[in-house]
Amino acid sequence: STSGTATEVTAFSIITDYEKGIKYPIADFEITPDVAIVDPDLAETMPQKLVAHTGMDAMTHAIEAYVSTANCDFTDPLALHAIKMIQSDLIPSYNGDMEKRDSMHNAQCLAGMAFSNALLGIVHSMAHKTGAAFADYGAHIIHGAANAMYLPKVIAFNAKDETAKKRYGEIADFMKLGGNTLDEKVELLTAHLRRMNDDLNIPHCIKNYGADSFPTEQGFVPEEVFLERLPEIAANAILDACTGSNPRQPSQEEMEKLLKCCYYDTDV
């Protein structure tokens, strides 16, 4: 069993077309369960790598739900509390603390309840469209790892919108990260997320993403292949269902630039 996607409480599912190299999100409240039993014992056998990836997936769910254009008074508390729990519990859970593993199981469920109602953003759009895009090269960009790599870049992109910047600042305040201005708070938030990736052995960019998902000097996605497929991936990401609730609507040019930042780990 896994702990991170919160499919037990959401209206979302995913179909992967490996021939086309695309993941398709499906959203319908008819697939939301009437009752969910969240049993933390089921998460205790998760491998360490899975703990890392699903944990950052849950963090992305909560942050994207909080800054989504569909956020509301009922989803904000769920998202913020999930963020705080993940901040304190994910790294210890990754290092084998089973009490924190239990707590993470609850946190990911809270994040799921938040995003199932508030929806997501382009971190997920990009993860959906890059995940299987290079499967012909013998590997898959694991969804949670993709979210972890892209989240700091998307925050920097979205924070150019003043409303989104304010929401990210509120997250940083809730996490007690410090900072005197909104710009400082956004920078501290992205820096904190990058440190979490370091602690979880997750790469910062596609270029350094190894076939085993661990950081490496040269990842499994060749630069020339990435650049060749970039326009199509960007177009597909813009059309993804999660893009509509993102606080900034990217153009084709902006999405390509953002994906390049995620490949090379350059500033947005």
Which residues fall in each region the model found?
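Catalytic-loop motifs flanking and including active-site residues across diverse enzymes
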Residues: 51, 55-58, 78, 82, ...
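Short, amphipathic C-terminal "tail helix"
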Residues: 220-268
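Glycine-rich phosphate/diphosphate-binding loops and the adjacent beta-loop-alpha structural elements
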Residues: 64-121, 131-136
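Glycine-rich phosphate/pyrophosphate-binding beta-alpha loops
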Residues: 4, 109-147, 240-245
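Gly/Pro-rich interdomain helix-loop hinge
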Residues: 133-136, 140, 144-225
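Short alpha-helical scaffolding segments that buttress acidic/His motifs in well-ordered protein cores
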Residues: 59-63, 104-112, 126, 151, ...
